[in-house]
Amino acid sequence: MAEWHKIIEDISKNNNFEDAAIVDYKTTKNVLAAIPNRTFAKINPGEVIPLITNHNILKPLIGQKFCIVYTNSLMDENTYAMELLTGYAPVSPIVIARTHTALIFLMGKPTTSRRDVYRTCRDHATRVRATGN
């Protein structure tokens, strides 16, 4: 879907965000679009499967780096988002939002609030969900 690259372009233009990626979680579990040469571009299927199957996951590996789960409502149909923090310095907020076919990963800069990252990621996911994807 060409819209994935448009979402990544919009996010990369915003100076509040450090990294973003869109990952298929239904079939191949591969990265569909990402900011090149960043952490989320390295996400592999072995890191996606625990996110969607294990509700009690505490320290998932994302892009070969550990993160700490803050809230997990990823598989909830009303919330469809997970908030995390990087497990390394500098600590940055991360949000993963679920559409019907993909996961949207968004990492804010250390100075960006969790609320801004959450709102932006959920807004993109809500728009994509409205189209049926």
UniProtKB/Swiss-Prot annotation:
Nucleus keyword on record: no
GO MF term list: actin binding
GO cellular component: host cell; host cell cytoplasm
An annotated GO BP: symbiont entry into host cell
Pfam families: Profilin (PF00235)
UniProt-listed InterPro entries: PFN (IPR048278), PFN_euk (IPR005455), PFN_sf (IPR036140), Profilin_CS (IPR027310)
Subcellular location: Host cytoplasm
Annotated keywords: Actin-binding, Actin-dependent inwards viral transport, Cytoplasmic inwards viral transport, Host cytoplasm, Host-virus interaction, Virus entry into host cell
Keyword Signal carried by entry: no
Matches recorded under SUPFAM superfamilies: Profilin (actin-binding protein)
Assembly description: Interacts with host TPM1. Interacts with protein A25.
Protein's job: Participates in either intracellular transport of viral proteins or intercellular spread of the virus. Cellular profilins modulate actin filament dynamics (polymerization and depolymerization) via direct binding to actin through an actin-binding domain as well as by modulation of other actin-binding proteins. In contrast to cellular homologs, the poxvirus profilins seem to bind actin only weakly.
Similarity comment text for this entry: Belongs to the profilin family.
Protein name in UniProt: Profilin
Organism from which the protein derives: Variola virus (isolate Human/India/Ind3/1967) (VARV)
UniProt gene name: OPG171
